[in-house]
Amino acid sequence: MKIIHKGLVEYLPTFEAMKTFNAGRNADTEDELWVVEHPPVFTQGLAGKPEHLLIRDDIPVVQIDRGGQITYHGPGQLVVYTMIDFKRRKTSVRNIVSALENSIIATLAEYGIEAAADPKRPGVYVGERKIASLGLRIKNGSVYHGLALNVNMDLSPFTHINPCGYAGMEMTQIADFVQPCPTPDEVAAKLTAHLETQFTPKADNNE
């Protein structure tokens, strides 16, 4: 699995690059993790409803092809796009989602933060507050899009939406629990290590 650090990049070109990568895959294409941050942007998934955008401001809204509803990306949030051929790995989308959740939970545990997935709601939570979001697109036996983990960011734009369609959803981030807060790059080193562990053949075959 190849890990590519892209830094702070605009959302729309990254979205187009994901689609291009997935469309051009073949049986020998190596899976990749893209580690990025984005300038402020709202992304509206396939299930998104306009009424979940509560306040219209100068933050752009991009309609995209992942599952789920509306979320926010901004600087200080660690985003990892998972370009994974799940058929070749003989695994399932559910197992991939679990691997993403488990990797986030293990990463947060390294910082002394107790987090958990919620079977009734997508994402990872600290208590009732959401600290990470997940969203995937399944196409041609592969997945793309991925996860977003709040590290040290301005959370106020989340109040302009119903995050992932949930009214009143409270958000949190690593900076609320750890000071000095690690940088997104420091968190990325731990998170990608856990992702690599989760996506070893042993993990893939543990269905």
From Swiss-Prot:
InterPro entries, per the entry: aa-tRNA-synth_II/BPL/LPL, BPL_LPL_catalytic, Octanoyltransferase, Octanoyltransferase_CS
Family: Belongs to the LipB family.
Active-site feature positions: C164
Residues annotated for substrate binding in this entry: R66, G67, G68, Q69, I70, T71, Y72, H73, S133, L134, G135, G146, L147, A148
Name this polypeptide is given: Octanoyltransferase
Organism: Neisseria meningitidis serogroup B (strain ATCC BAA-335 / MC58)
Annotated Gene Ontology cellular component terms: cytoplasm
Enzyme class: transferase
Pathway: Protein modification; protein lipoylation via endogenous pathway; protein N(6)-(lipoyl)lysine from octanoyl-[acyl-carrier-protein]: step 1/2
Further details from the record: In the reaction, the free carboxyl group of octanoic acid is attached via an amide linkage to the epsilon-amino group of a specific lysine residue of lipoyl domains of lipoate-dependent enzymes.
